Each structure stands twice: as structure tokens, then as C-alpha cells.
């Protein structure tokens, strides 16, 4: 171990020390596989780890755009062989203003190529810690919300029951109901929900349908998804319809505004969120709407609202929440057609990666015994 001078801060010191402890086994296997399947590089290539055809992480601008360049698993019956299963839910039929979130899974996958599997601050290398597969997208039905819900529920149910950790790429927030439904059916106890958003999303209907403003009304109608275990973080602004606020008040959900969280401190806010979501629950689902961030950071979303969180506040929240296990995560309302320099898709990718990394660091992933 090298010497550290006094100018290192505690986080930087931890990160640098931790990196030295991480294995490189999977990286070496990836290089060897690339040379075997992609052919050794041309004679003029000095670095003999470089193949002729791009395989694996490098270069970041090349390759097939699965999430984090994870293997594409055509046979979804095998998803239980992996620790994490990524699936897209390309649906924006529940949108009440800007559309385009049907392209969210594509946008997130595309920019995820920019990321490596190693997090400096977390001291985690996902490639060395867990296995990830990209299952592709659920076959959604653009003109039929209810059939799409059935498709999404079946897909999430399949992944969750396999033992893989589901990562769902939305899609508008109407998918929150069918994703929760797909998990809840496999639980003997209750399912809590930690919901990041600027909007309450608790109306019964909107525009006469179960739109992206309604998922938690219907999710908390599921017998083992009680409203007392729904905590909604970041709610505020001029886009919180009164019928939804009324439902939350009557059902006893917990709402935490941005100001609430900032004034009490992110650590205390996360502690409260965990207390509510886990109160008597068997498992907790994380539903992350990118519009919980200030609109300056997420222009590519269906209902942008100024006054939201800063990215570092959200990432700190995620780090604390993932100290406890999660049933899965969904990222919703990422609309690439309205994005600027892919920054909305970028933060969506970061939230997923930090969630996985923190779960690994806390010992919650992989979920299954390797014995």
C-alpha cells in the first residue's frame, strides 16, 4: 500500500485504499474473451489486449447498446442465472403532457455505455461483484394501457420470482402500478414503496384512464401494498393536482417535500423514509421519477418542475436508502426527444448504478447464496 499524505480527505482515502483491494478477475476474463471472439488486434496495435472487433467495455463509443454493455439475454427463461436483470418498459400511453418516454429505455442504454463498472467513491466494481443481463424490452401495446399493464406485470413477476434483482427502465410513471403488482404477488407480507417525484401520482383516474398521475392509487389498492408504507419524496410545485393530494391525505401516505428534506438533512430524511417504507413490510420497491430533480438537470422529461433536488442530494439519498435491501428499482419519465446532451438519461443511469453499487457494498447483492 502506498503512502498517503495529509491532503487526502476521508472519502478519497477510502476510495484509493479500497481500489487496491478489488480483484481484476472478471476484467481479465473479459479481455481474454474479447481476443478470442473478436480476434487479436492488427499487428500495428501495441496494446495486445485490444481485439480487432470491439468486445466488452472499451471503447465506450462503440459496441451494442445494452445497459452497461451487459450481455443481451434472448432466452428470458434463464434470467435467474444472473444477479441483476434489466428490462425496458417502453410505454408512454399514460402520459398527459409530453410524450417520448417510450424511448427512455433506448436513451438510458445508449448513454450507459459512457459508464464503466467501477465507482471511485463507493469502492465497488460491479463487474467483479455481480452478474447483469439485459433482457431487452417488454412488448408493450401503445394503444392499450391495461394490456400493457398486464404485459409489464407478467415480465416483472417473472424476473422477481427467478431470484434476479429487477431494474426496470421506463416508460412513463403509469408503469409503477404494474411493476409493483408483479412483485407483490410473490410476497407473503407487505411491500413498501419509496417514491421519488415532484408529483403525488395518487389520483384514481386522469383523462378518464389510469395515467401516469395514478399509479399509487391503484398500487395501494393491492391488499399487501398498504398506503402507510408509501413514502413520497420531493413532492411540490404547481403540478400536484388536488384530487391526488386528497387521496394521500385520506389514505395516510407520507409526503416529504424538497424543503422538508433539505432542512432536516438528507441523512435524517432518508432515515424517516426507510422507517415508513419498512414499517412491518417484507420488502421495499424503489420508484424513481427523474423529474424529482430540478428541471435544469432533467430537461428530458414529461412534466419538468423547477425547485427539485440537486443531483448530489439525490445520490446521497440513494446511498442511504440502499443500506437496506430493495426488491427492485424502476426509473421512469426519461424522455430522450426533449433531452439536452443526454443529461437526463445520464442521471437516470447514475441512479441505477449507484443503487446497485450501494446494494453491493452493503452486502445485499448478490441476493442468493453461492453455496
Regions found by a protein language model. Name each.
Residues 2-371:
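Conserved alpha-helical scaffold segments that buttress catalytic/binding sites
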Amino acid at each position: 500500500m502506498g503512502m498517503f499524505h495529509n491532503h487526502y480527505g476521508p472519502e478519497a482515502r477510502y476510495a484509493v485504499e479500497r481500489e487496491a483491494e478489488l480483484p481484476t478477475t472478471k476484467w481479465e476474463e473479459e479481455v481474454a474473451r474479447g481476443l478470442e471472439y473478436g480476434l487479436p488486434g492488427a499487428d500495428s496495435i501495441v496494446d495486445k489486449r485490444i481485439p480487432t472487433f470491439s468486445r466488452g467495455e472499451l471503447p465506450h463509443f462503440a459496441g451494442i447498446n445494452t445497459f452497461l454493455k451487459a450481455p443481451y439475454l434472448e432466452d428470458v427463461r434463464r434470467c435467474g442465472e444472473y444477479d441483476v436483470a434489466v428490462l425496458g418498459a417502453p410505454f408512454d400511453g399514460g402520459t398527459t403532457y409530453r410524450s417520448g418516454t417510450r424511448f427512455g429505455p433506448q436513451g438510458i442504454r445508449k448513454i450507459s455505455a459512457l459508464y464503466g463498472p467501477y465507482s471511485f467513491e463507493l469502492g465497488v466494481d460491479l463487474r467483479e461483484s455481480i452478474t447483469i443481463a439485459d433482457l431487452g424490452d417488454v412488448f408493450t401495446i401503445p394503444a392499450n394501457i391495461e394490456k400493457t399493464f398486464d404485459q409489464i406485470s407478467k415480465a416483472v413477476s417473472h424476473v422477481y420470482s427467478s431470484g434476479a434483482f429487477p431494474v426496470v427502465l421506463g416508460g412513463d410513471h403509469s408503469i409503477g402500478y404494474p411493476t409493483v403488482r408483479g412483485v407483490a404477488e410473490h410476497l407473503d407480507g407487505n411491500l413498501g414503496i419509496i417514491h421519488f417525484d415532484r408529483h403525488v401520482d395518487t389520483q384514481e383516474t386522469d383523462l378518464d384512464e389510469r395515467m401516469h398521475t395514478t399509479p399509487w392509487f391503484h398500487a395501494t389498492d393491492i391488499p399487501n401494498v398498504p398506503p402507510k408504507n408509501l413514502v413520497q419524496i420531493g413532492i411540490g410545485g404547481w403540478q400536484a393536482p388536488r384530487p391526488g393530494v386528497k387521496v394521500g391525505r385520506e389514505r395516510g401516505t407520507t409526503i416529504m417535500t424538497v424543503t422538508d428534506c433539505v432542512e432536516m438533512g438528507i441523512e435524517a430524511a432518508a432515515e424517516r423514509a426507510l422507517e415508513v417504507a419498512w414499517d412491518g413490510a417484507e420488502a421495499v420497491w424503489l420508484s424513481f421519477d427523474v423529474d424529482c430533480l430540478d428541471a435544469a438537470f432533467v430537461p428530458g422529461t414529461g412534466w419538468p418542475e423547477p425547485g427539485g433536488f440537486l443531483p448530489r442530494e439525490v445520490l446521497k439519498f440513494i446511498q442511504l436508502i440502499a443500506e437496506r435491501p430493495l426488491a427492485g428499482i424502476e426509473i421512469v419519465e426519461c424522455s430522450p426527444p426533449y433531452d439536452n446532451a443526454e443529461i437526463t438519461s445520464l442521471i437516470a443511469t447514475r441512479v441505477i448504478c449507484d443503487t446497485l453499487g450501494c446494494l453491493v457494498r452493503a452486502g445485499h447483492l448478490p441476493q442468493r447464496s453461492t453455496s
